Amino acid sequence: MANKSVTVGQLEIANDRPFTLFGGMNVLESRDMAMRVCEKYVAVTNKLNVPYIFKASFDKANRSSIHSYRGPGMEEGLKIFQELKQTFGVNIITDVHEIYQCQPVAEVVDIIQLPAFLARQTDLVEAMARTGAVINVKKPQFLSPGQMGNIVEKIVECGNQQIILCDRGTNFGYDNLVVDMLSFNIMKKVSDGCPVIFDVTHALQCRDPFGSASGGRRDQVTELARAGLATGLAGLFLEAHPDPNTAKCDGPSALPLDKLEAFVAQMKAIDNLVKSFAELDTACRD
């Protein structure tokens, strides 16, 4: 199976290329916080020579509670993204939830993301595809990896071949997620070699069944990220925060920002090792 590549700015993203770090924060909390987090990621990835794309949401439209913080909104969020690009020269990924958001967001950021909960909404998928932007498709928690081929087909039928697929865990009963390490290879196959990345942060979510916000297992982020990258991926999706306990969204799953350099160094070492191996064809044939 040949690996397809997606070009974002000067970066080439593919399953057989050095992994790209899609990193930042869950939601834009403020302009100053975004600058602080982005600055740290840029410093670490420049030092370690790791390709980097900044990620954050301007609106978390699928929060559990109506009282939860959602973000600054599209207009203010795009202004912050523009400042980050001008200041740090970063490429940016963010998600959209409504059809009207697709074109204006695609004019500012480099990758638009299809949220997991919305990945089968055909009208939204088509609107995103027709922008011509690179699209990152989050695998829904309720969907098998093999079904991702149908979403890819919708995008391709709209004339867009710039597709990245992302796993963020699968429902394991109520209010819990697990990651099937075989799913990455299945997603590569059903997409004919599209880049596949792993959202380790959201895979760590674990809810209180009666609570109004997601819990998490940040103490297991290193082990889970190591395991994912050991399968040979195009990228890792990671959220970090200076003080995860006070983060406005998904703090329990976020990496403490001061641990970022040590974490990324480990991930790079694993990625380098795995991609130094020759690929073995172990399929049984008559």
Curated annotation (Swiss-Prot):
**What family classification does the UniProt entry report for this protein?**
Belongs to the KdsA family.
Which EC class is the enzyme in?
transferase
Q: Cross-referenced InterPro entries, in alphabetical order?
A: Aldolase_TIM, DAHP1/KDSA, KDO8P_synthase
Query: In the record, which residues are listed under signal peptide?
Result: none
The reply on keyword Cell wall biogenesis/degradation is: no
What compartments host this protein?
Answer: Cytoplasm
What is the protein's name according to its record? 2-dehydro-3-deoxyphosphooctonate aldolase
EC number(s) from the headed UniProt entry: 2.5.1.55
**Which SUPFAM superfamilies does this entry report, sorted A to Z?**
Aldolase (SSF51569)
Pathway(s) per entry: Carbohydrate biosynthesis; 3-deoxy-D-manno-octulosonate biosynthesis; 3-deoxy-D-manno-octulosonate from D-ribulose 5-phosphate: step 2/3; Bacterial outer membrane biogenesis; lipopolysaccharide biosynthesis
| GO MF entries | 3-deoxy-8-phosphooctulonate synthase activity
GO biological-process terms attached to the record: keto-3-deoxy-D-manno-octulosonic acid biosynthetic process
Catalytic reactions on record:
D-arabinose 5-phosphate + phosphoenolpyruvate + H2O = 3-deoxy-alpha-D-manno-2-octulosonate-8-phosphate + phosphate
PANTHER family documented for this protein? PHOSPHO-2-DEHYDRO-3-DEOXYHEPTONATE ALDOLASE
Assigned GO CC terms: cytoplasm
What's the chief localization of this chain? cytoplasm
Which keywords are on file for this protein?
A: Cytoplasm, Lipopolysaccharide biosynthesis, Transferase
Ranked from the top, the taxonomy reads: Bacteria, Pseudomonadati, Pseudomonadota, Gammaproteobacteria, Pasteurellales
